[in-house]
């Protein structure tokens, strides 16, 4: 069968990679065109009988916040136009949307109007920001595979019969890492503090400076940045303007870093849950453009209490969230002490992680999603 997959961010690339593997295990001769990153493109190497083509790379797609999207509007609109044309030319049996809602929901409306079957993997967080989108999603999607147990109530209450809970794919990814032998953990004579400043250039520029300030005042720890070559090594060098003896950067090996870490400072996103699955106490941070933040407060803040996946899933403040103005050196220093020297605080966080892991259930999300996609592609 023919599959068209669209992922627009680093987390989507990770989940898309695992989904492609699962699809190929069920359909070894699949014909796949995709928007994604290096992880998704690497799947082709182990699939000699499949036909896999990358259309666009995520480095050209990941824009964060209302203002950033507007400033790249011509690029976004150009990508939408090209995507529509490419789908029509390819004529897939099913279109699979992986997160990335601002772009993907527009394409879903188009593909539905042209008679294609649509499956959305990793539900847009409409329960937090745009409940009005539930109606067009019901219309445009043949299947919606959501990954958070807390979303079940929302889709049940909003009469969305084609929504299915598949479990969280990060459980599969972390389990795969733990059972593999290809580990390259970070070596240090000091306790390692992981710095995860995000997967977008805008995030990196905003959150990394305070992390570096913290490191300069804590020479008793080794601070290691989870770098991404996708962003470009030059940008890290531009931000790290002085030589700090206890700061290093490792690239594209976040799990090796987390497996070696005593604590972490993490930019909000998928990485907060990954850090929790590795049971590393963390402080979560987030900063965006001021106007973007003001718009978000109007549309989102009144609907949700937390921004990190750990807190959202447990519906409690398991980990500290430092957002916008609260993310400054003084607050970070205070919360850093709690996750490093306060044994009771660390134990409370680890207990919260255990609750979250229990709520997520078991592994197998990618395989369940692939099975559902093939069923829908076959008209079942």
Where are these regions (language model features)?
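Nucleotide-activated sugar donor-binding and catalytic core shared by glycosyltransferases
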Residues: 1-380
């Amino acid at each position: 069968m023919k599959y068209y997959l669209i992922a627009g961010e680093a987390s989507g690339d990770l989940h898309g990679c695992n989904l492609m593997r699962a699809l190929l295990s069920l359909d070894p001769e699949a014909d796949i065109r995709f928007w994604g990153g290096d992880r998704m493109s690497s799947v082709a190497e182990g699939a000699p009988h499949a036909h896999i083509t990358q259309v666009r790379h995520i480095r050209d797609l990941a824009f964060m916040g209302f203002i950033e999207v507007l400033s790249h509007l011509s690029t976004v609109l150009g990508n939408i136009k090209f995507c529509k044309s490419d789908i029509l030319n390819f004529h897939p049996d099913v279109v699979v949307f992986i997160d990335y809602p601002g772009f993907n929901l527009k394409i879903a409306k188009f593909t539905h109007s042209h008679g294609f079957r649509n499956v959305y993997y990793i539900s847009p967080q409409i329960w937090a920001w745009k409940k009005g989108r539930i109606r067009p999603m019901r219309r445009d999607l043949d299947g919606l595979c959501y990954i958070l147990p807390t979303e079940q109530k929302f889709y049940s209450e909003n009469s969305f019969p084609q929504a299915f809970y598949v479990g969280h794919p990060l459980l599969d990814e972390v389990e795969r890492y733990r059972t593999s032998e290809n580990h390259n953990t970070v070596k240090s004579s000091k306790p390692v503090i992981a710095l995860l400043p995000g997967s977008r250039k805008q995030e990196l520029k905003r959150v990394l400076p305070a992390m570096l300030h913290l490191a300069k005042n804590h020479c008793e720890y080794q601070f290691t940045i989870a770098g991404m070559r996708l962003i470009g090594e030059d940008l890290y060098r531009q931000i790290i303007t002085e030589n700090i003896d206890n700061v290093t950067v490792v690239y594209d090996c976040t799990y090796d870093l987390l497996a070696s870490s005593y604590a972490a400072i993490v930019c909000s996103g998928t990485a907060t849950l990954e850090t929790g699955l590795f049971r590393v106490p963390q402080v979560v941070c987030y900063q965006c453009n001021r106007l973007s933040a003001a718009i978000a407060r109007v549309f989102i803040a009144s609907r949700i209490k937390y921004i990190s996946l750990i807190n959202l899933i447990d519906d409690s403040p398991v980990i500290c969230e430092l957002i916008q103005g609260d993310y400054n050196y003084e607050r970070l220093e205070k919360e850093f002490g709690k996750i490093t020297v306060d044994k009771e605080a660390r134990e409370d966080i680890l207990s919260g992680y255990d609750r979250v892991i229990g709520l997520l259930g078991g592994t197998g999300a990618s395989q369940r999603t692939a099975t559902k996609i093939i069923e829908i592609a076959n008209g079942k």
